[in-house]
Amino acid sequence: MGFAVDNSRDSETENRSAACDLGHNRLGRPTGSRVADVIIDYLSLIGVRHIFGVGGANIEDLYDAAFFNDDLTAVLAKHEFSAATMADGYSRSGIGLGVVAATSGGGCLNLVPGLGESLASRVPVLALVGQPPCTMDGRGSFQDTSGRNGALDAEALFSAVSLHCERILEPADIATALPRAVAAARSGGPAVLLLPKDVQQSVVDLTARDIPTADTVLAADDPGEIAAELRNATGHVTIIAGEQVSRDDAREELERLRAALDARLATVPDAKDAVASSRSSAVIGVTGVMGHPGVASALTKGSLCLLIGTRLPATARSGLDAALSLVSTLSVGSAPPFVPCTHIHSHDLRATLAELTTALERQDPTSRWSSDSPPEELQPPKHRGPGVRYRDAMAILDDALPVDADVVVDAGNSGAAAVHQLSVRPAGRFVIALGMGGMGYSFGAGIGLAFARGRRTVVIAGDGAFFMHGMEIHTAVEYGLPITFVLFNNNAHAMCVTREQLFYDDRYSYNRFRPSRIGAGLAAMFPDLPSRDVESLDALPEALRQALSVDGPSVVSIECSADEIPPFAPFLDNIATKESQPDVAASA
């Protein structure tokens, strides 16, 4: 796997108290099966190998149970938001279900933005949330979230950021509640189990093997409904692939369908890795605000658009509405898109796309897309100030990354540049969270991805994202994870600086920072962490080579400018409007 986690338990086992109310066997594990044991053992049986969380009094029994399971590791994060994004990244890897655990009170409340991202992006995540004992519901207990007698109602709260939320009050109910929650998560989004401490500690006449672990089977529509329309298309077809293609591991099936249709292929921004090769002549780039202009022109030259595994939200649809209005639109996926279309439902794109391809066998497999030409790029204005340019840095990074590297990108200017200009590794993943678009997501998600896939993971983030959740680098150091953090330090929330400049006449800035030396600071904080600042383009190739060659984590902090405009269509459209109509007042 390229990293090691110390699972030695001998000394800790010897130190465990034999005076636990439940009693302990000679190996230290409590006699009988607690609800906490059943949960952990069940997760292990269905293939979960890591759970992510932050400890606390009302979740510690779950960690205790994990200690005694040799097939599952409980990972300690620094913050519950990042623990949730670790589970999200783990799930996006395709390895298995992402699981996050948090204690009651402020700890569980920190899960909300992470689960919100998973809900909006339809990522399967199971959240195990500790609560005070049921006997104290509504009686003023510390961190009471029972909803009784004026207490915060955790069930109502988490129901808003999940597909399924259930509070367990009877220990035996875990036998039905746990598989129900797992099934809900596997349908595409978070599920939450609220677990009072006394329930977790209760001994039940039940083991994990007594609970059914059958795979969730979800109904799908007959793809024949759209096969006829595709077969009878009078012009060429443009496919826009979404994040469900990656989640369902349907890349090969997508390419076979594309070949059968001789279609052009684009992806939404958070599905760059849905295509086998972004350099294929049939690939026309990324859609939306950080996408490629050629997608809209390809749509207008064809007669039909096929959406696969995407709802095409505004971020992915920007600039396409006019083109979409001129063509027929079909859709396959787990949820209907936000645009008018004929939609067929599928929770398993591998199966559905294979069926669709079989129904569309072409007699002439010759492709009309024979010439290799990269997608047309957006052209931001040239920046002549100090700092390394985004485009230049991405070109060097593109040359340096291993063929199997996974890439996780954060929100912001550096993220827009990476989505627009950095190619997907042939054997790697490319992850960006645009459901909620919260800054700091990449640090936890990169850790989850590294645990899941055990290969070099590259996190690309700005200094603003780092100051929010970058201390999860400590988690990468603690577990020796193979993650290279590439930080673009422009001493600002630079995308917000650009908005101040373009939409508010550059009268002020709330979003510029005093200079910081992130690379040097992390090197001082973690003496064993290779970490450096890079101030010139010439120094970047060697810095990346060294950072990517170490066994564990590393950091490269690149000095860039907050005044450089990223490849982000709304900014470029605003600049173009001002240049063509210089007397028109800026509008937000």
Per-range role (PLM):
Residues V54-G56, A74-T85, V100-G106, L169, ...:
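Active-site nucleophile and cofactor-binding loops and adjacent substrate-binding regions
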Residues V5, D10-T31, L169, V192, ...:
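Phosphate/pyrophosphate-binding active-site segments
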Residues V161-L163, S303, I396-A405, L522-L529:
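A structural motif corresponding to the C-terminal end of an alpha-helix
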Residues L128, M136-N149, L353, A416-A588:
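Thiamine diphosphate
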Residues A36-I40, S44-V48, V54-A57, L62-D64, ...:
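Active-site diphosphate/adenylate-binding microenvironment
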